[in-house]
Amino acid sequence: MPTSRPFVLTPGEPAGIGPDLCLLLARQAQPRPLVAIASRALLAQRAEQLGLSIELRDAGPQDWPGEPAPANCLYVWDTPLATAVTAGQLDPRNAHYVLETLTRAGRGCLDGSFAGIITAPVHKGVINEAGIPFSGHTEFLAELTLTEQVVMMLATRGLRVALVTTHLPLRDVAEAITAERLQRVTRILHADLVSKFGIARPRILVCGLNPHAGEGGHLGREEIEVIEPTLAGLREEGIELIGPLPADTLFTPKHLEHCDAVLAMYHDQGLPVLKYKGFGAAVNVTLGLPIVRTSVDHGTALDLAGTGRVDIGSLQVALETAYQMSGAA
């Protein structure tokens, strides 16, 4: 085992910008050892398309790098494609390749080979088109690590937003917000802010579900019947929670100035504000896993693959956050 465990980078959808991100990142020397789990042939082809001269160095279970690669160099754990890739053109035959890169990364973290995973975007649709049920990175890694409950959190400079519910139709959100779910999510958020972000006593702002946080029950009773009593019980466990507050006033400097995270009830309640504040410089973090996993905050951008018009800002933030969470910063 090397003295400094490497982090691993999975490029996601091979026809998207994930391979481009890996190569563009490799132009700079990295502060920590970093291995891309990808097809070496794909990276070589994409580098040629981008006009980049990047040395691809082999890495694998018998020879993990213990030192960072220099500029214009990338360590690669070669993972074969099922079929050749054309930038921007999806092919379901490569769905198993995408999942194999994630499986290698997750298992390597579990056995102690890797310090953390940074993921580039996958295309859920083409994986499902291949006949493989797939909801996303978060659910896949939760199953791989035998984790019952995980929490999605996005972060940018000065703001962290975690979600009680994630990819649900809006009509199903209220029913999904149960006392049990709210307890589990809040406990995971609090625990990981302490253990992975080094915040001794996190201060968490909690959004209400309804406009004006229910207006005393006139605009919905979820705050009165579920959210408020659940938060009261969690406060007795020593968790510092403020709310439920109306989301339209919670996301103002007055409230955000002294908080460590916001807990939003649903996807589009919290994430538009965060993405407006930090799009291109935000990171997606999976809380509750026994491993460190961060991701970029954008999609596969098939139309930009192979063009060189790709911003690596979100990937850099994802790397920095993974280093921080693992104690390697």
Curated annotation (Swiss-Prot):
Q: How is the cofactor bound?
A: Binds 1 divalent metal cation per subunit. Can use ions such as Zn(2+), Mg(2+) or Co(2+).
User: Where along this sequence does the record place binding of a divalent metal cation?
Assistant: H167, H212, H267
> Pathway it belongs to?
Cofactor biosynthesis; pyridoxine 5'-phosphate biosynthesis; pyridoxine 5'-phosphate from D-erythrose 4-phosphate: step 4/5
Coiled-coil ranges (or none): none
Which UniProt key words apply to this protein? Answer: Cobalt, Cytoplasm, Magnesium, Metal-binding, NAD, NADP, Oxidoreductase, Pyridoxine biosynthesis, Zinc
Indicate where this protein resides in the cell.
Answer: Cytoplasm
Could you give a single Gene Ontology term from the biological process aspect?
A: pyridoxal phosphate biosynthetic process
Name the coenzymes or cofactors required: Zn(2+); Mg(2+); Co(2+)
Domain of life, per lineage:
Bacteria
Q: Which Pfam families match?
A: PdxA
EC numbers, comma separated: 1.1.1.262
Gene Ontology annotations for the cellular component aspect, listed alphabetically: cytoplasm
Catalytic activity of the protein: 4-(phosphooxy)-L-threonine + NAD(+) = 3-amino-2-oxopropyl phosphate + CO2 + NADH
Tell me one GO molecular function of this protein. 4-hydroxythreonine-4-phosphate dehydrogenase activity
Q: Where does substrate bind?
A: H137, T138, K275, N284, R293
How is the subunit organization of this protein annotated in UniProt?
A: Homodimer.
Q: Which family does it belong to?
A: Belongs to the PdxA family.
Q: What does this protein do?
A: Catalyzes the NAD(P)-dependent oxidation of 4-(phosphooxy)-L-threonine (HTP) into 2-amino-3-oxo-4-(phosphooxy)butyric acid which spontaneously decarboxylates to form 3-amino-2-oxopropyl phosphate (AHAP).
User: What PANTHER family is this protein classified in?
Assistant: 4-HYDROXYTHREONINE-4-PHOSPHATE DEHYDROGENASE (PTHR30004:SF5)
An additional note in the Swiss-Prot or TrEMBL entry is: The active site is located at the dimer interface.
Protein name according to UniProt = 4-hydroxythreonine-4-phosphate dehydrogenase
Origin organism is Stutzerimonas stutzeri (strain A1501)
Q: Which gene is this protein's source?
A: pdxA
